[in-house]
Amino acid sequence: MRTKQILLFGLVTCSLTGNMACKDADSEKTLCIDNVRMISRVTGDPLPGDTLLNPNNTGPDFDVYGTDLGLMWHMDGNRVGMFFGDTSGEGFVVNKNGGNGSNWRSNVLAFSSDTELTDGLKIDSMLLDADGKALEVCAGGKTNPEVYQTSIPTSAIRAGKTDCVHIMNIYDWGAPHGRWLTNFSSVYTSNDDGRTWERLEEVTFSPDSHFSQVAYAKRDGWIYMLGTQAG
């Protein structure tokens, strides 16, 4: 029996206990998870009657009151980068209809060196703009509002001393059959530990590409990019 902590980004840090053996694909052993327990929030303010820990004051500190999906990757040492998708500022209200509030950003970036997750994930810092608010890293709807809806990170990885994040640039969320449409997908890179980012325009995937969304993996000195279509 082992215990591990995982993150459900934008919502809670969870603790999992159980038989967590994972073998090769042709093995009969599988990953088994039980006893899932919510520990803390990662971003945002507590809800009325909320008893979860909330170690990060992301609302007043960074104007991050609500976030979309999140992803994390190992940078160096104990340092982890965390990209969040669509992010709302002051005035955000939790509801089933999506984002609201002020200061919409398509994505924001946080950093953590916390290795003890039993009391929640603590954010050390976020990438900030001149006003001290979490900065939109990958250009979203505000740069081309007639065409761009938003730019959502799908996966990130460090290669040598370069950090890379794959994004999908959304054209329409309301396509038929629950799908969404992209203008393109691309990669942004940073060579200064996440302080500045630039888009690699030569790495661009078309709207019908099977690399509209990806997951990165490392093995034997190679980096693999596993892709799928948008929506």
Q: Model regions: which residues?
A:
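N-terminal regions that are enriched for targeting/export leaders
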Residues: 26-169, 181
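Bacterial Sec-dependent N-terminal signal peptides
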Residues: 1-27
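Asp-box/BNR beta-propeller loop motif
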Residues: 190-198
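Active-site cradle of extracellular carbohydrate-active enzymes
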Residues: 217-231
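Repeated scaffold domains used in trafficking and secretory/extracellular systems
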Residues: 154, 207-215
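Short loop/turn motifs that cap or connect beta-strands within the blades
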Residues: 202-205
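Short, solvent-exposed loop/turn segments at conserved positions within beta-propeller repeat blades
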Residues: 176-183
